[in-house]
Amino acid sequence: METVFDINEIMKILPHRYPFLLVDRIVEYVAGERIVGIKNVSINEPFFQGHFPGHPVMPGVLIVEAMAQVGGIYAYVTLGDEVRDKVCYFASIDNVKFRKPVVPGDQLRIEVTISGCKRGIWCFSARATVNGKLVTEAELKATFADKEKL
């Protein structure tokens, strides 16, 4: 699996940092179509301390957040300088389905397909798989806002 963006490049694109940076690398980027990211799920993730002791499961909302971060990378790379000083935010999350639990040792493959962009709202369809099996799917919308207007 070839790396398109490694973690150092991702950290130049996304504002997220540990423990909330949930993308380890990007392995595919097709302008106008899709992006594929990888998240290696380790027992050392801080959320496993409480979710759930003795039965660690990655929280579904963090899988959705990882999907959003992969989509955000796509939008930041596509728009470049136009959004360099802006922050990408969720606008909506729809039709989320959690199919299987994600546990320590799993490698999440997150494929985000771009549905379009209208009036500054990006629309994405996202699928997360582990070993080729679907674990989560969702439809996401995101937009950019100026940092100083927050």
UniProtKB/Swiss-Prot annotation:
Molecular function terms, GO-annotated: (3R)-hydroxyacyl-[acyl-carrier-protein] dehydratase activity
Catalytic activity: a (3R)-hydroxyacyl-[ACP] = a (2E)-enoyl-[ACP] + H2O
Residue pairs linked by disulfide bridges in the UniProt entry: none
Main location as per UniProt: cytoplasm
InterPro entries xref list: FabA_FabZ (IPR013114), FabZ (IPR010084), HotDog_dom_sf (IPR029069)
Classification of source organism: Bacteria, Pseudomonadati, Thermodesulfobacteriota, Desulfuromonadia, Geobacterales
Enzyme's top EC category: lyase
CC terms in the record's Gene Ontology section: cytoplasm; membrane
Active-site residues, Swiss-Prot/TrEMBL: 51
Official protein name in the record: 3-hydroxyacyl-[acyl-carrier-protein] dehydratase FabZ
A Gene Ontology BP annotation from the UniProt entry: fatty acid biosynthetic process
Cited function: Involved in unsaturated fatty acids biosynthesis. Catalyzes the dehydration of short chain beta-hydroxyacyl-ACPs and long chain saturated and unsaturated beta-hydroxyacyl-ACPs.
Keywords: Cytoplasm, Lipid A biosynthesis, Lipid biosynthesis, Lipid metabolism, Lyase
EC number: 4.2.1.59
UniProt family annotation: Belongs to the thioester dehydratase family. FabZ subfamily.
SUPFAM superfamilies linked to this entry: Thioesterase/thiol ester dehydrase-isomerase
